A protein has these predicted regions:
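Active-site beta-loop-alpha junctions enriched in small/polar residues
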Residues: 7-11, 32-36, 62-65, 105-107, ...
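Generic enzyme active-site microenvironment
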Residues: 28, 59, 144-145, 173-174, ...
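Histidine-acidic metal/acid-base catalytic patches
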Residues: 1-3, 12-22, 97-98, 130, ...
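Active-site acidic/histidine proton-transfer and metal-coordination neighborhood
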Residues: 15, 52, 71-171, 273
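Residue-level detector of anion-binding/catalytic polar loops
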Residues: 27-28, 56, 98, 142, ...
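A short acidic, helix-capping loop that chelates divalent metal ions and anchors anionic groups
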Residues: 66-72, 108-115, 206-211, 244-248
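Catalytic-core regions built around general acid/base machinery
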Residues: 42-53, 127-135, 187-190, 222-226
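N-terminal pre-domain/capping segments
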Residues: 1-94, 193, 256-274
Length: 274
């Protein structure tokens, strides 16, 4: 069984949030949000509130949009993107966060790119990631490359591997609802040596959905057992808002869902109708 964590996406980060985490048995949080949220987060206040209720600041999801401002794969945007992300990494590192989740590109029309254009996108991402890896190292942590949906880079295990080749200090975050097509277990096993954190959510194989496990098509016993087989030592971190797919959830619902998966129980209906 893994300790349970939640992303802050779709949530107000305040003392009430951390108090509810403690009451439910949520071990940690990933700091995430919109671009303007990142610019305005008071990390000192967040750290103080988290410490008060014994909640660990596990990871920091760097902003990935607006796409006309942030894109590590686009020549005209990559330098400023690295600058923005670099400052956020330094700030997060100052408060003990050591895993920085990154999207290696914005939305791109892959089917409209020539081979040379795609290659340049990959090379630009690699250069950007190498720069961020150095900043993260100085901050005491690692940049974690996330697998992404088909309109982005990277979408395949070999593409993630290619990006990781930019710097040996790069690590991986596997998102279980970004394989279109694909199987989360293939990514877990194919990237096991670099895997340090996950984003847990379900989907329908049509688009990313960020649903509660049990609402989609993911085989959660395969995912759980796959993580154990590769000796994954991180957390079971949900990237799901409190309002998702017609349901409203509380921290206790996520804990119940996780425990049902860990104990190989039939997944039920969690939360209340929206």
């Amino acid at each position: 069984m893994y300790k349970i964590a939640l992303s802050s996406t779709g949530k107000v980060i305040d003392e009430k949030l951390f108090e509810s985490f403690k009451e439910a048995g949520i071990h940690a949080i990933e700091i995430s949000g919109l671009f303007e949220d990142h610019m305005n987060y008071d990390m000192g206040h967040i750290k103080k509130a988290a410490d008060k209720f014994g909640v660990k600041l596990w990871s920091y999801h760097l902003p990935f949009k607006p796409f006309d401002i942030i894109d590590l794969s686009k020549r005209e945007l990559c330098k400023n993107s690295v600058k923005i992300m670099g400052e956020l990494i330094k700030r997060a590192g100052d408060y003990g966060i050591d895993k920085y989740i990154v999207h290696s590109s914005g939305i791109i029309k892959r089917d409209e790119l020539s081979q040379d254009e795609f290659h340049d996108r990959m090379e630009c991402s690699k250069e950007s990631l190498a720069a961020l890896a150095e900043i993260a190292h100085r901050a005491g942590g690692n940049v974690c490359v996330e697998n992404l949906p088909p309109k982005c880079i990277p979408t395949k295990v070999d593409e993630v591997r290619e990006l990781l080749s930019a710097d040996d200090r790069l690590r991986v975050c596997v998102d279980t609802n970004h394989m279109l097509p694909g199987n989360p277990v293939d990514f877990i096993k194919g990237l096991a040596d670099k895997l340090v954190t996950v984003h847990i959510s379900d989907y329908d194989l049509i688009n990313e959905r960020h649903w509660m496990p049990g609402q989609g098509v993911v085989n959660w016993q395969e995912v759980y057992n796959g993580l154990k087989e590769v000796n994954y030592s991180g957390l079971w971190l949900y990237e799901i808002g409190y309002k998702s797919n017609g349901r409203i959830y509380s921290p206790k619902d996520f804990v119940q869902n996780a425990n049902d998966i860990f104990e190989n129980k039939k997944l039920g209906v969690y939360g209340i109708e929206q």
